């Protein structure tokens, strides 16, 4: 049984706006959202009711609302909730794509609900939606070396050794979102989690 109902679907990439953050680990969600839009020939436009940037794409065989909040990561929840309300998307049909410290760099995992793992963007989304029971595409960035502050680590650009692999990670994130919509959570997890 697919986890997504026949209601509208909202796919959100999390990140920070502006060129200073464009290539940081924390902006992986934005990078995957940009890739999904480009693959469908779509362009993000300001969404007046939410303040986010949004577009509509075909993904997993259906029309999907794709968005990037335009506030900073830690306050992205209200824009996500406003989009969900505007498009009549239940929380179980909201898919949030985000960087994940608790996964090795390059790993992609799918999840429904659960904790935020210290991710303030997810915390903001959970508070604004009034539930943690939404879908996540978790994009592994790994833990910082030594005693480096994780908050500083995610705001840095990728290490030189990682940079060449970022496009593949974004492709896999985009594929994971599509499988999630097409197959539902469990079947999509079976495929995505076998990627390594």
Swiss-Prot record:
Annotated localization: Cytoplasm
Positions of the record's site feature: Discriminates between blocked and unblocked aminoacyl-tRNA: 16
Gene Ontology BP annotations: protein quality control for misfolded or incompletely synthesized proteins; rescue of stalled ribosome
Active site feature: 26
Binding site for tRNA: 21, 72, 74, 120
Classification via CDD domains: PTH (cd00462)
Sequence similarity: Belongs to the PTH family.
Protein name: Peptidyl-tRNA hydrolase
Organism this protein belongs to: Mycobacteroides abscessus (strain ATCC 19977 / DSM 44196 / CCUG 20993 / CIP 104536 / JCM 13569 / NCTC 13031 / TMC 1543 / L948)
Name of the gene encoding the protein in the UniProt record: pth
């Amino acid at each position: 049984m697919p986890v997504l109902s026949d209601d509208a679907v909202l796919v959100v990439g999390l990140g920070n706006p502006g060129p200073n953050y464009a290539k940081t680990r924390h902006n992986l969600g934005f990078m995957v959202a940009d890739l999904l839009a480009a693959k469908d020939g779509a362009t993000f436009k300001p969404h007046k009711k939410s303040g986010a940037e949004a577009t509509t794409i075909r993904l997993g065989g259906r029309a999907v609302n794709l968005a990037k909040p335009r506030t900073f990561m830690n306050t992205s929840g209200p824009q996500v909730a406003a989009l969900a309300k505007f498009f009549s998307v239940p929380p179980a049909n909201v898919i949030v794509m985000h960087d994940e410290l608790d996964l090795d760099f390059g790993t992609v995992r799918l999840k429904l609900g659960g904790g935020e793992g210290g991710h303030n963007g997810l915390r903001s989304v959970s508070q604004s939606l009034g539930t943690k029971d939404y879908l996540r595409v978790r994009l592994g960035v790994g833990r910082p070396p030594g005693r480096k502050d994780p908050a500083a680590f995610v705001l840095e650009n990728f290490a030189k050794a990682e940079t060449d692999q970022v496009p593949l990670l974004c492709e896999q994130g985009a594929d994971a979102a599509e499988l999630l919509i097409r197959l539902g959570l469990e079947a999509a997890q079976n495929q995505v989690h076998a990627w390594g």
